[in-house]
Amino acid sequence: MVDRIDPLDITNIKDLSTWMKTKNWRNIAKLEPCRFKESGRGMRTRKGLKAGQLLVQIPRLLLMTAGDFRTSKEWSWIVDKNLSCHDALVLYLLVEKNKRDSSFFHAYIKTLPEVFSMPTDLRSEMTHMLPNFIAMKLQDKIKSLQDSFKNVARGYKSICIKELGFSDFKWAYYVVNTRAVHITGSSGKFNADSSDCMALAPFLDLLNHTHDTSSISGFNPYTNCYEIETLSKTPKCSEVFINYGPHDNLSLFVEYGFMIPRNPNNFVPFEMTDFISACNEYNVKLSNLCLQTINLHNLMKNLGCFADGPSWSVKVLLKVLSCDWSSLMRIEDIIYRDFENHGLTEKTLLNCILEKKKEELQNSLSTIAKDKNCQIANCIVSFLEECLSIIEFSYAN
């Protein structure tokens, strides 16, 4: 369903298109802005698109890159060479925004959202309501945000001769985090191992992501443009999507502030402590040999449930936890050949873990669902409901 888009948005996007056309950009896929009920602001096409067609082609001149900032005559002498690519791009955006109308990228900056609703801005009391696996991931992100602020603030003060406010920093950080593209595999102008592997691309970031479309993207050294090619058909007057890659909803929620219903990549992670707790509850003894085997074979990675059930790592770990000493001596057979035959102990431990995870999710869900004043609360509720359905499916099967 298409809703009416804000007139100011339309004006700003028209101004952006006009400016980009003066720099040899063309709207090759006949895209136009719309507001969609399901995905918010996005782009639809005025013509049907076939697989293999280019969606966007952004000239190199219009890309904002950390490398351009570092090597500019204006700022190269003052930019800290130790800044990460991400932080340098955040600083570049803040410096350009501070220039206002005189910025080369002024038309682009006007199209960027003025505010972001992100989980890192949740009140502390709501963060405490979240399941542990979400809260831990969120805490890591908040720490990363704070570290980035310290790095960027020093450079901003040197360049703009004023202090950087945390709210202004967060705006730029979220712009880069949610909109920057990674540019690799080109003719050497961009290098994933260098300080110039990310870019902000005007117009491109108006396209929304979905898991059920296919697209390829990258910098084309022959056209000197960043290009996205669709591998899916799009009917006339329909929203045009791109695919960021296979992200689970936890990553999408923490990094970008949204989730995708029925995401096939969705994953509810488990911690090793979940397994130890279940073993303690059912008096399953963990010998030193068992723990050494788990560490030796790196069996604590990728623990959790997908939409179709527990991960391979969970099945193997449960088998190892249920083994006696003699069985552990033939561990290779257990890990690579025999793990599909589940014993009673394995099923008991798994059900214990699933029951506790289900209870944790239900408690969080019932509490957060009562908060009607937080914009991102609805996203959290949807995310928790998806996680709960995954756990319930695994429990039933």
From Swiss-Prot:
Protein name stated in the entry: SET domain-containing protein 4
Cystine crosslinks: none
Example GO molecular function: histone H3K79 trimethyltransferase activity
Keywords of this entry: Chromatin regulator, Methyltransferase, Nucleus, S-adenosyl-L-methionine, Transferase
GO biological process, one term: entry into diapause
InterPro entries: SET_dom (IPR001214), SET_dom_sf (IPR046341), SETD3_SETD6_MTase (IPR050600), SETD4_SET (IPR044429)
Protein residues bound to S-adenosyl-L-methionine: Y244
Gene name linked to the record: SETD4
